Amino acid sequence: MRNIAVILAGGSGQRLGENIPKQFLKIAGKKVIEHTITVFQNHSLIDEIVVVVHPDYIRDVEDISLRNSFNKLKKILLGGKERYHSSLAAINAYDEEVNLLFHDSVRPLVNERIINDCIRALLTYNAVDVAIPTTDTIIQVDDNNEIVKIPSRILLRNGQTPQAFK
């Protein structure tokens, strides 16, 4: 089965307070999204890359692809208002059965082992999420915003990406 990396780049970066989304800011001479795509471009088990992006930044992604010779980048799709709309656009772009690895464009530090582990886990499971133990204290509140419970950190994880699906 083919392994497709779906780079979710539709965010507007409002929380960052910049004029452009954070995936298009430069770090170490390249845009963050370039670093992220490079990881998947260079991974031997990734067959294809699709980027889901806000319509205003399609040309930017095309330029990035040409400049870096990203030959695995086959599709640039329009992102939706919410993350799930963008994810659905990627799902709908493939009629055949494929493994889809959804990854945030602003997480360029994903490594080969994590990608390998996700793909390998899809041999057993239909859905896989990368998760790390939480170090934060999480609180549960009621309608009055009063603390009603503090769950044990032993049972909690922070979900990360990629999130992979058959």
Question: What residue ranges belong to the model's regions?
Answer:
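Conserved core of the sugar-phosphate nucleotidyltransferase
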Residues: 109-165
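Residue-level signal for inorganic ion chemistry
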Residues: 7, 33, 90, 103-104, ...
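N-terminal glycine-rich phosphate-binding loop and ensuing alpha1 helix
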Residues: 2-58
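A general structural signal for well-ordered alpha-helical segments in protein cores
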Residues: 58, 84-87, 102, 115, ...
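Hydrophobic packing residues within well-ordered alpha-helices of enzyme cores
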Residues: 16, 60-62, 118
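Short beta-strand-to-loop acidic/aromatic patch adjacent to the donor-nucleotide binding site
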Residues: 97-107
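Conserved N-terminal catalytic core of the sugar/cofactor nucleotidyltransferase
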Residues: 34-97
